[in-house]
Amino acid sequence: MNEADGRFAGDRGCGDIHEPMVSEPAGRTVRGLLFGSVAECYERYRLDYPNELVDIVLRYAGRPVRTALEVGAGTGKATRLFASRGIEVTALEPDADMAHVLDRATRGLPVRPVVSTFEEFRIESRFDLVYAAAAWHWTSPVTRWARAVELLVPGGVLVLFGRPAELKDPDLFAAVEEIEKRVLLGDDPVEVHPWSIEEMAAADGLADVEQRDLPYVATTTAEEFVGRLATVSAYLKLSPDQRAGALRQVRAILPDQVDIDATVQLSLARRVDQSVS
């Protein structure tokens, strides 16, 4: 890490980290739109998803999946997996900087990046699959389930997944958690909307809800782990000096290599087929 500016030397390859400037008219920072300030680092440090994830989704679907809508595509970590199977993906990403990296990372694949939120996306057709990779908590809890159903063909599949990417060692996990309790700001309920499998199961128009885990432990360097933390919204809400100080504190307590719990957690549901036979 460069002590002068709080950045890792390796971050030079991520491009400039600029201050988030996304605000609503009232001035409240839109936390879900902070990631563009670190788009290149997001692509570099966020973990990729395993191919097995797509296998699980396709088996669950039980029928051809030709089209998909991705909610909050980011830089295309999950987009590339599905598109590489020949699925035509409409990838929604509300942040223009993230969408720029997404477009570059998916060239040559059947991907149509769209700069839009899930709520504002204009419905032109229905999809065989709607999915979100670590992004569903940015959607509106009032409309998201009904909108997902509206966007799916009868019998189509909704898949929500993510991975914790947390330190496997309980002592290190607790030590980092203690630092974060001191320096990070709490979640704003106006910005972050957690969801549960119970909500998914209770949503009108969805059935056959299942949960699957893909256990995986990744070994990474401390610098890569801290680089990933620098792309987390809770850190991006801090001022540059606060963020650099927090990351220095975390790096100081880590060994050179760490094991990460990178288990992929999936929730799957099917739109009820209301067609008349």
Task: Cite the ranges covered by each PLM segment.
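Conserved Class I S-adenosyl-L-methionine
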Residues: 197-277
